[in-house]
């Protein structure tokens, strides 16, 4: 149950992240060329690459690790709550899960912010040394791309905790027979084998 709940919670967050990536990318007219080595890849490769889609994939992949971490934390929390107090109903599990989720989301979004901004610290120092205004810095495509990564990644993480809590509350409120039926119908291993063929 724990792994299944975490999987569904992670996928819901990544779906939101991917959707927002396309929306924000279109609004801000991002072309993907702000990525490190993007020009080198285009000019040195014989393949026809869509740099914009690679940029979108980088955003989703960048957020996926933290999303999995939050989803597993929330799933484990719901499991422990139900294990120690089997009388808890779905509503009580959701309330307790949300209380834990607030703490988890705060630290994870900060981690994501620091991970993205840490890589561009020397670049920001260079901008400040050249006496560039904040407006000039924000209008640079490279900076805009990083801001979009941070915003989209954070929104995706904020979605993961409540979605995992809702999913976990539903799954852990079901009796064992219903869970076995869901697992047999889902057949995750069969789906993965079909994809890998």
Model-derived features with residue positions:
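Oxyanion-binding "anion nests"
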Residues: 53-79
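Pore-lining and gate-forming transmembrane alpha-helices of multi-pass membrane transport proteins
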Residues: 9-14, 44-61, 107, 137, ...
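Juxtamembrane inter-helical linkers in multi-pass membrane proteins
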Residues: 35-45, 80-96, 153, 182
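Hydrophobic alpha-helical transmembrane segments of membrane transport and translocation systems
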Residues: 117, 123-197
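Transmembrane alpha-helical segments of multi-pass membrane transport proteins and ion-pumping complexes
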Residues: 14, 18, 22, 26, ...
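Helical hairpin unit composed of two closely spaced alpha helices linked by a short loop
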Residues: 69, 80-123
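Transmembrane alpha-helical segments that form the functional core of multipass membrane systems
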Residues: 1-42, 49-62
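Juxtamembrane loop-helix boundary motifs flanking transmembrane segments in multi-pass membrane proteins
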Residues: 3, 52-55, 85-97, 135, ...
């Amino acid at each position: 149950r724990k792994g299944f709940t975490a999987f569904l919670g992670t996928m819901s967050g990544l779906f939101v992240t991917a959707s927002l990536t396309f929306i924000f990318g279109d609004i801000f007219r991002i072309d993907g060329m702000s990525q490190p080595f993007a020009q080198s890849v285009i000019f040195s490769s014989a393949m026809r690459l869509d740099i914009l889609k690679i940029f979108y994939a980088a955003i989703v992949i960048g957020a996926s690790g933290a999303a999995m971490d939050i989803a597993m934390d929330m799933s484990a929390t719901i499991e422990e709550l139900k294990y120690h107090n089997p009388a808890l109903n779905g509503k009580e599990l959701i309330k307790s899960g949300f209380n834990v989720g607030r703490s988890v989301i705060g630290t994870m979004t900060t981690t994501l912010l620091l991970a993205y901004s840490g890589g561009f610290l020397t670049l920001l120092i260079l901008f400040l040394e050249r006496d560039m205004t904040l407006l000039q810095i924000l209008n640079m495509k490279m900076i805009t791309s990083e801001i979009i990564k941070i915003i989209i990644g954070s929104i995706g993480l904020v979605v993961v905790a409540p979605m995992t809590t809702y999913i976990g509350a539903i799954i852990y409120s079901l009796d064992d027979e219903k869970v076995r039926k869901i697992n047999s119908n889902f057949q995750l291993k069969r789906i993965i084998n079909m994809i890998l063929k």
